[in-house]
């Protein structure tokens, strides 16, 4: 092996430290929090969050309570590491501290790992330094830290240490003493790296890399290392068992929830299409992923980097850097008989399969794998899962590429020192040009560096004085996406639950429990219809004790929800049983007269179970009902709900002989609204009117897009908001993404629904309920809007044959009960309790009435057990 020049002092390490310190200094903003997007912030209340992580299987604070669907327990390790720092440092520094520490850890992980391969003494050499700089400054790393998530940055920081320590362990199986030391080191590193697996799919990626490395060593060294490989696999599972077992319980009992959630249903195909746009070799060589194109409110998500790469010289620097990677790949192919090189090439194949999703033959394999709905859901955004192994192997290949060029120059009789000086200087110049925005403060998204107003800490202090089980409804509410924008700058999935112990009914938790999502559908119906009594019933049904209205929240891209927020604030004072309790600047806290406490009910009515609905008419008629397949009371039309998937509609809907047939019930057909409908003008290059030669001829509008989107809308100007309607759409999906469809009022007061049409072949008919949101005739005009979108270079093509709107008296239909029973009254007997996450001790002072039931507000999950003694 040809060694590059060495120095008497560790100037290379000093150089790395200086570069890292420079990056930290220019990217740290004093008096701000690193907050927003997706974030884990236990430092707000470290002791409370430690308890949550320790008892992670049940997430009581998430809405109605749910079985943890993320690797919540994994963050326990990180929280224990952070604990002493939270006691001595301002909490606003903690996230900066962790992510900057991971930058140091990952950079020096590459450095020390490669130093063993390329340097025979403890003196410095240049190859590890150059490769470490690549690991730090490549564009994959920049994207990974742009909106830093603790799981991602931890994986980035520990991955080099994990892989190099595994290589060391497998290389020393013939030396028992050395092997024992390496095993202890490997166990220690695997324990520290556990926070990486908060996003569990990263654990799957890590396991895949481990198995590929083990396979490479077994192929090249034979059976000698088999016992050691079995031992390390068992140890990895044992080390991670404390969070894998709770997650296994989630998979057993709640797997369908994240797959069926409306947010995941709407975003899975779209997320993969975004990844597909960057699934080409030209992007792979730059490690450029879908973050680069991600939209923001006013510009692209990574606008500073987009401007930087608009200069072809900067882009060329990146491709020149990739030449070293390609040379290293060729070198590893030449050395493929060595297990390390074989394992590198196997990991390269894995990340190529994931990231080259638009490049044959990897695209064909991708399409085959994604026929499985679960795998398609889990790996809908492969970039964030596979980019770290890609960065790692690219860094190692860079080192081998440098070594190969130096070796070649030496054999060609060039001066090694002069050639090395030119080569290293050129590389440093290229990587400096390529990554220059990092040194101008562009490591983190600028909107993620914000101050948190004092009013939030006042609110946190207030809730510390309240019952920890008191459920909170947070308002205003917008769409189902669970993405919140604050007027003072924070944008993301939310943060207040990191310092509020009470359960919060936020949209961020809907994906893990469909009961949370059902609450949202009822809530948005009540808010848009401005019905105080209906909202009061929702608060009662879901045992909500507090309503938190935060006027700092706004909806920059949804004017309809902005209007709803204004009206919500006005009518909260009219909600029966709800009174203003506390005001902290723009944050208003209301208390409902019914507490979040266990209670007894006697002889409750038993109804048939429902799935999704707009309004729970069963609860209006029979508060605190039970559900059973053998129920005597049935609401056959209650779950005639169309805001989600067409396949979930429980009743067949048809039009026959001038009648609307829903199930076996007929309703008169009124076609008058369709006489005055109109649609927006066609855009010539993407929207085409097609007429077939059939008899009779078939006419439809074809929408075609490549890496673009366009809208087409049907307007029904005479549709009054005081009525409910049934919408029929006849459409056909050809290829790419299916159509999204939404219905709004022309005056932008109401958004009736927003969903995605099916991808079934052939002509399909979709039905949608548009419920009445007004009891008075103040406005008319309904728009039905279709969006044909392609987020990649793949064609999206869909046809629309007809869009028709018919009046339908929906509310009397949905409230129909069979047989007809008189309404019942609510008869709750509230009880005192002592609670501790898994355990609720409830004292019943007097013998309960016959046929009494104990209701625990957490019983929206079926997994609780009650014992009476």
Identify what each model region corresponds to.
Residues 2-4, 651-664, 700, 708-715, ...:
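Active-site-proximal, structured, solvent-exposed surfaces of multi-pass membrane proteins
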Residues 214, 238, 297-305, 317-353, ...:
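Hydrophobic, aromatic-rich transmembrane alpha-helices
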